[in-house]
Swiss-Prot record:
Record has Ribonucleoprotein as a keyword: yes
Species lineage: Bacteria, Pseudomonadati, Pseudomonadota, Alphaproteobacteria, Rickettsiales
GO biological process assignments: translation
Keywords for the protein's UniProt record, in alphabetical order: Ribonucleoprotein, Ribosomal protein, RNA-binding, rRNA-binding
Disulfide bond sites: none
Entry's Gene Ontology cellular component terms: cytosolic large ribosomal subunit
Protein name (database record): Large ribosomal subunit protein uL15
Subunit details: Part of the 50S ribosomal subunit.
InterPro entries registered for this protein in UniProt: Ribosomal_uL15, Ribosomal_uL15/eL18_sf, Ribosomal_uL15_bac-type
Domain of life: Bacteria
């Protein structure tokens, strides 16, 4: 076997149709497009429905993507309480982005972090949890705080470093 004797099997490569090369080719003159009309002359525009108002124009405009949207990683005080109970946060710790990344509590490091206080409808902090938080003397260095979170942190004797 030599390189100059190699060839493809029958049907391995299909030849492209040569259109517009005379009547005898089978695809001459109108080139398989038929006679006259919009489709014989050029492509029909995308979304064109034959003169009927296109779907894209029939539907109302809806919404947009805000350029100024702020993406936050949400951290709840109950999550921090669980970390305290699991001995992952010690006395006097500064809770910031680096600590939360180290503990794998954040999805993305590029987003800002917002601290929320416990949602009264789902999980409520009991007196044991509150006393545990006050003993630890935690300091928070996060980007944003909910109003109730900031108020309760200061009330319990913990510190908000920024904002």
């Amino acid at each position: 076997m030599k390189l100059n004797t190699l060839f493809n099997l029958n049907g391995a490569k299909k030849c492209s149709k040569r259109i517009g090369r005379g009547i005898g080719s089978g695809k001459g003159k109108t080139c398989g497009r038929g006679a006259k009309g919009q489709k014989s002359r050029a492509k029909v525009a995308r979304g064109f429905e034959g003169g009927q108002t296109p779907l894209i124009k029939r539907l109302p405009k809806r919404g947009f993507k805000s350029m100024n949207k702020r993406n936050y990683n949400i951290i709840n005080i109950i999550t921090i309480l669980r970390l305290v109970k699991a001995n992952k946060i010690e006395y006097g710790a500064v809770i910031d982005k680096l600590l939360l990344l180290k503990l794998k509590m954040l999805k993305k490091s590029i987003n800002k972090i917002k601290l929320l206080w416990a949602n009264p409808s789902s999980l409520v902090l009991n007196s044991e949890d509150i006393s545990l938080l006050t003993k630890l003397d935690l300091q928070f260095n996060l980007d944003e705080y909910s109003i109730s979170a900031r108020k309760n942190i200061i009330k319990l004797g913990m510190k908000v470093i920024n904002n």
